[in-house]
Amino acid sequence: KIYMKKIHVGFLLSYDYIKLKNSIPPVYKMADKIFIAVDHEFRTWAGQKFEVEATFFNWLKEIDKDHKIEIYKDNFYIPTLNAIQNDTRERHLLSLKMGIGNWLIQIDSDEYIPDFKGFVNQLKKYNHYLDNPKENPIQIAGFHVDIYKYLDDGLLYVKNTCKVLLATNYPNYKLARQSYERVI
């Protein structure tokens, strides 16, 4: 089987969708494809309905000059599952849609990778893990800084960083983005 070894980035669209206007542009140029998962009835993991203004979808079309963005609609709310189980399920289905054999990067709407080009260049050093992902599942982590408050002249942030799981070669998620596989 020939693997594509592409950079596929996935986002989950929900009630905080407007934040995607900040998180999509930094990854657009380096991503081979961008997938945006949204419940087909616009429901959260807890089953609450939300609305998305048409102007947001217009904005997506405007910025998608290279036709990289795909909206993936599916039933992501199962009433017999709790919110974290629905979260995990949506991430898994999104990753399957993104295609095993590619780097599967999932970024939450309130997360930004300031040097996405550097992240991708580092990620490509591990492309050999895409040759047989089921036998060699890994997750790629980065560090994230929690922004406390935006100010007119900057921002306040929490000094201590923590690890965040951003990419995988094989999406066997157990809890949100966590698969409990080897982390690099």
Question: Where in the sequence are the language-model features?
Answer:
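N-proximal low-complexity "stem/linker" segments adjacent to membrane-targeting elements
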Residues: K1-K29, I36
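Short, conserved active-site loop motifs that form the nucleotide-linked donor/cofactor pocket
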Residues: I7, H67-E70, P137
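Short, solvent-exposed loop/turn segments at secondary-structure junctions
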Residues: S14-D16, E41-F42, F76-P79, D110-Y112, ...
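Active-site-proximal specificity loops/subdomain of glycosyltransferases
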Residues: D39-W103
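Catalytic-site signature of metal-activated, phosphate-bearing donor transferases
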Residues: L81-H92, Y112-I184
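Short beta-strand-to-loop acidic/aromatic patch adjacent to the donor-nucleotide binding site
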Residues: G101-P114
